[in-house]
Amino acid sequence: MSTAIAWIEGQWGTAASLQLPLNDRALLLADGLFETVLIRNGAPQLLQEHLQRWSDSAALLGMDPPPQRDALEPLIEDAIQRSQLSEADGALRLNWSRGSSCLLYTSDAADDIRCV
């Protein structure tokens, strides 16, 4: 049976144990993109096409480019192993965010400026 895992900011963990920062623009404003890759018998299907579309979409949205294939392949292989999909079928979701930002709420009091 496969296990839902996540890799966020350089750390592996279960999807439930890792957290996105609350000020991440993908979380706050849906300012991000994703690709879902079919894993069949431990092999990512159409990976080059998914990664090209991921990169093209980031450029279209004016975002920084996501990591390239040579940086992602070891992580993808590690994810397949960790989620026990080496001889199984499943899905891998790649998310890319514009990053963190601060929503400022101002009033007359300078003390009332908050980053959420």
Residue spans for each PLM region:
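Single conserved hydrophobic/aromatic residue that forms the stacking wall/gate
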Residues: 105-116
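Conserved alpha/beta cores of soluble small-molecule-handling proteins
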Residues: 1-107
